[in-house]
């Protein structure tokens, strides 16, 4: 099941507000800047200072952030694909949410649903967005983990 997102937790811009130099942030010999955020929040992964970046994979992930493109990383189970994305996001202060695409995730979790809510003392039906629309609206990197799972 996908965890319900606290929609009120929004004390930062929804769009990147700084440019980071890849050479300085990742110690890679490239003249490239990547958009990021000046502030962290609860959805920004924690930085692992001991993490070792693979240059080609890192540049692919950074290109995705820079050009707002999807990036697919594939490899054997347990080789650190999702962690690599999270560690890049952590250094850019990008929100990053990992969604395990196992049998417990439904279309409703991903897209959203109509829900009965109380507003101003009146019961109404209101659309509650799932993880995909929420992420699109809130500047969040989504990692679909185990997309090929049964």
Q: What is each stretch, according to the model?
A:
Residues 1-150:
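AAA+ P-loop NTPase catalytic core and its hallmark functional loops
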């Amino acid at each position: 099941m996908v965890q319900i997102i606290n929609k009120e937790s929004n004390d930062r811009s929804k769009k990147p507000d700084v440019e980071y130099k890849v050479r300085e942030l990742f110690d890679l010999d490239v003249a490239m800047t990547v958009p990021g955020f000046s502030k962290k929040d609860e959805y920004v992964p924690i930085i692992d200072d001991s993490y070792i970046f693979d240059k080609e994979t890192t540049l692919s992930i950074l290109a995705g952030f820079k050009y707002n493109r999807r990036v697919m990383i594939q490899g054997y189970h347990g080789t650190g694909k999702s962690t690599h994305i999270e560690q890049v996001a952590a250094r850019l202060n990008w929100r990053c949410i990992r969604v395990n695409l196992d049998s417990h995730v439904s279309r409703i979790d991903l897209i959203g649903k109509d829900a009965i809510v109380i507003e101003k003392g009146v019961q109404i039906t209101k659309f509650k967005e799932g993880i995909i629309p929420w992420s699109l609206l809130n500047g969040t990197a989504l990692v679909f983990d185990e997309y090929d799972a049964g």
